[in-house]
C-alpha cells in the first residue's frame, strides 16, 4: 500500500511523516512518534484512554486515521507540562487530590479535562461529571477525579480551592 505524506504539529513541534493510510492516529503517536502517554484501552472509542487535543477539540485518537490529522495541531499528555517540567494545573490537581490509582486512564482523563476547562473555566460538579462522561476509570469511582478538576479550575481562576463537604 502506498504511504501518504502528512505534516502536523505535535506538542508544538512540526512533524512530517509517511504513514500507511490505515494507520490510526493513536498508533502513529505511540509507535512512530514515541509519545506513549496516550494509552490504547479499547481501540473502539469507548474508554477515552487515547484522548488527545486536536485543533481545540478532544479526540479519541483510536477513532481517526493519522492522515485525517494532516495539517492539525495536536497536544498529547506529554505536551501538558511546561518546558521546565512544571506540572499543569490539572496534572497538579490529579497529584494533589489523588485522582488516580492505576493511572491507565489518567492521560486521557487529563486531556479531556483540559478541554472541558477551556470550554468552561468554572464548571459545577455535574458539568464535570458530564464533561468526562466519555472517559472511563475502572479504579477510582471518579470522586477524586472530580476533585482534581475542581482543584485545577480554582487554581486557573486564581481562587482558593475549597473541598465540598462529604
Swiss-Prot record:
Disulfide bonds: none annotated. SUPFAM superfamilies: 2Fe-2S ferredoxin-like, CO dehydrogenase ISP C-domain like. PROSITE patterns: 2FE2S_FER_2 (PS51085). Keywords: 2Fe-2S, Iron, Iron-sulfur, Metal-binding, Oxidoreductase, Plasmid. One of its GO terms (molecular function) is 2 iron, 2 sulfur cluster binding. It is an enzyme of class 1 (oxidoreductase). [2Fe-2S] cluster 1 binds at residues 42, 47, 50, 62. Its cofactor is [2Fe-2S] cluster. Its EC number is 1.2.5.3. Binds 2 [2Fe-2S] clusters. InterPro entries: 2Fe-2S-bd, 2Fe-2S-bd_dom_sf, 2Fe-2S_ferredoxin-like_sf, 2Fe-2S_ferredoxin-type, Beta-grasp_dom_sf, Diverse_Oxidoreductases. [2Fe-2S] cluster 2 binds at residues 102, 105, 137, 139. It catalyses: CO + a quinone + H2O = a quinol + CO2. Residues 4-80 form the 2Fe-2S ferredoxin-type domain. Catalyzes the oxidation of carbon monoxide to carbon dioxide. Dimer of heterotrimers. Each heterotrimer consists of a large, a medium and a small subunit. This is Carbon monoxide dehydrogenase small chain. It comes from Afipia carboxidovorans (strain ATCC 49405 / DSM 1227 / KCTC 32145 / OM5) (Oligotropha carboxidovorans). The gene is coxS.
